[in-house]
Regions:
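Arg/Lys-rich, alpha-helical DNA-contact motif
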Residues: 2-7, 13, 46-150
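Short glycine/proline-centered loop/turn elements that form peptide/ligand docking sites
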Residues: 11, 18-21, 40
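The alpha-helix within a helix-turn-helix
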Residues: 12, 26
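Residue-level "edge-of-site" marker
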Residues: 25, 38, 72
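Beta-hairpin "wing" of winged helix-turn-helix
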Residues: 31-39
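Minor-groove-contacting beta-hairpin "wing" of winged helix-turn-helix DNA-binding domains
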Residues: 39-46
């Protein structure tokens, strides 16, 4: 990995998104440049490229919309903060409170994913029902054709 800050085009290329998309994600608050050049140009670290890749994964591979992506990223950011706080904390009661908050966040994310899975399952069932109707209709049309030809 490179320690040199990346320009916007380099970061976009590494994450396989367009510069316009990267800027749009910034406008939405999903991503922030790690630094700016003296001239004000955006500069990105490898962590920023990893976040861009995570946004793409959530959006393109898992089918999350941008509001859902924001929810996941916010939760993941908070979980990262909690992880650091846990390891910096010596007090067991404070650690317990940190873990309880992490569990609550994780539970909310699981519920959101479950709701999405249920919506997808419903959509899949609708598509299967349509396929069954189309198949039955096609079979009926073939039977009619065969009856008139034969």
């Amino acid at each position: 990995m490179s320690a040199r800050p990346l320009r916007i085009g380099e970061a976009a290329a590494r994450a396989a998104v367009s510069v316009r998309t990267l800027r749009y994600y910034e406008e939405l608050g999903l991503l922030r440049p790690s630094a700016y050049s003296p001239g004000g140009a955006r500069r990105y670290a490898e962590e920023d490229v990893a976040r861009l890749a995570r946004i793409r994964e959530l959006k393109d591979l898992l089918g999350f919309n941008l509001d859902e992506v924001r929810t996941v990223l916010t939760a993941e950011d908070r979980l990262g903060d909690l992880r650091a706080a846990y390891h910096a904390e010596d007090d067991r009661a404070a650690q317990q409170a940190i873990v309880a908050e992490a569990l609550e966040i994780n539970t909310r994310l699981q519920a959101a994913v479950q709701a999405k899975l249920e919506r997808l399952a419903t959509f899949k069932a609708e598509l299967e029902a349509k396929a069954d109707r189309y198949g039955a209709s096609l079979a009926g049309l073939r039977d009619e054709r065969d009856a008139t030809v034969g």
